[in-house]
Amino acid sequence: MDPINGSHSGANATISDITNGAYNATDAGEWTSSVMFKLRTCVLLLIVIMAVLGNMLVIVSVMRHRKLRVITNYFVVSLAFADILVAMVVMPFNFSVQFNQGWVFGETICDLWNSSDVYFTSTSILHLCCISVDRYYAIVKPLKYPIKMTKKMAFVMLAATWLSPITISYVPIFMGWYTTTDFLESRRDDQCEFKVNKPYAVISSSISFWIPCTIMIFTYLAIFKEANRQEKALHARAGNAMLMHRHSREVSDKNGALHINATTPTKDRNLLKMKREHKAARTLGIIMGAFILCWLPFFLYYVSTSLCDSCNCPEVVTVIMFWTGYFNSALNPIIYAYFNRDFRNAFKNTLACAFCSFCKRSASDLDAMERLDRRGSAQLRVPIPSRRASDLASL
């Protein structure tokens, strides 16, 4: 065997193996990338659909059930409406960026998207802040609650909740106050970055998250402290009532007299009301905690990258933090259904009615089609005997 030819053939085989290995690695990488892209698309679509349908269920259930039409749920319904707008206005643009791997809507829509993102995030946390204040008066200061938390006051708070975030979203972003001059001059139509200056980062994050979050934490600490005190007093009162009842029974047995121990309806109503307020506070406290857990990573990232010029974050981490915050809009209806019996029963009833009405409509459509078929077949059969009768008559 020629050593030169042998070395050439060995080299060719080695090159062929390397080339095939590179092609296989490329195919495997493309397959993995394709699978991850499809999986990510499905997850993001699921979040959008859950947010829209779940919060629509909340709104319809409160409207249909009189038991849920209390002042606290005015804020819950308004929060659900804000979450629906997040799912319909904000999430689709972010989904488009992930799907198209770029921005295709131009500068104006980019500003609109960034403004809406800031606006609805601020609106959501201000709703939770209003709910915490409502629960604070209901549990810590129950005598002042009917005076302070009227329907008029609730509508004033809701108006402030919807109007005040405009000052840190649409106005500064469309006026160009939120960023630097260099960034405005170097903007491109195929990119939608939200690069903010340091004053705007501090002011917007404080109004949107840090100040309301601090208020909520302190109000809920006071709420749970008062709730624990009331429960301890309730258990002590129940224990004393049991001792008094036992003592009165012993005395009545000795005297041979009949003793009836009955609680007053007013005490029963107050007890049920207190338990209901505590359950509502627990559910809304869980909602507040879920909101903080979902949005805290993003705001830490937002402030740190805005104040630190050399701090960078991988794009995949940024996407995860954005969609973790968006997921909170889909999470609230699940929390209502799991932790609050009134909402759970209302959801079941609303879904059952929707399903029954759909079934009835489908059945009525089928009946109508059957009637049309019978009428059509009858019309087809009528001329035949009539024609035969006329023929016989002519004969």
UniProtKB/Swiss-Prot annotation:
GO terms for molecular function: octopamine receptor activity; tyramine receptor activity. Residues 64-74, 141-154, 224-282, 337-395 are cytoplasmic. It is a multi-pass membrane protein. GO terms for biological process: adenylate cyclase-activating adrenergic receptor signaling pathway; adenylate cyclase-activating G protein-coupled receptor signaling pathway; cellular response to amine stimulus; octopamine signaling pathway; positive regulation of MAPK cascade; tyramine signaling pathway. Residues 1-42, 96-117, 176-202, 304-315 are extracellular. It is found in: Cell membrane. This is Octopamine receptor beta-2R. It comes from Chilo suppressalis. The lineage of its organism: Eukaryota, Metazoa, Ecdysozoa, Arthropoda, Hexapoda.
